[in-house]
Amino acid sequence: MNKFWNWTKDLMTNTPELVLEGEIASETWWGDEITPKLFKDELNKHKGKDISVWINSPGGDVIAGSQIYTMLKEHTGKVNVKIDGLAASSASFIAMAGDTIQMSPTAMMMIHLPSTFDWGDKKDFQKTIARLEEIEKAIINAYELKTKLPRDELSKLMEDETWMNAYRAKELGFIDEVLYTNEEEKSQTGFDFSKKKVNACMQNSINQIPVSYTHLRAHETR
């Protein structure tokens, strides 16, 4: 079994963190009862708790991706997804399970059509094509729920093998926030607040000038 996930904890907030790193299941979860159960059992240890899910993955098995997506959607606490490197292929629709989805300004997301290897006669290939078309529709379901984009537009993005930086992903609705951008806003807010205090102090000093001057003139005329 290739365990592509592990659990850590944010030392500042004590929030459980699920880290998805590398290929999502090098072997398919189709017919595998052990690996999905292990993943679910570990997730259930944090039942009712808010969790963060860090993703850096090129994707992998669609069945595994589907099960992980569903387990995260079923989680009773809030799920905050953070993409720090790459969320491609099946990892991209796993990310859609987040109640909130954040992305590093240096990270990338990629969506494309499902693919497979097959052999046989023309009927076998026709069945494979039909199966891939249904898988595409299933993946679009996850994208559509998050982005609210039309299905034909999502299908076109997949056909084009679309790569998105964080700002493009936010523009299209795949994520909610680009990480660390609020720090600049907070800094600017702090600066504005300080500037207001300085201006207020200066104005107060100016307002005191006529009073002092009047007092001085009155003293001089005595």
Name each model feature, range by range:
Residues 1-90, 98-217, 222:
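N-terminal organellar transit peptides
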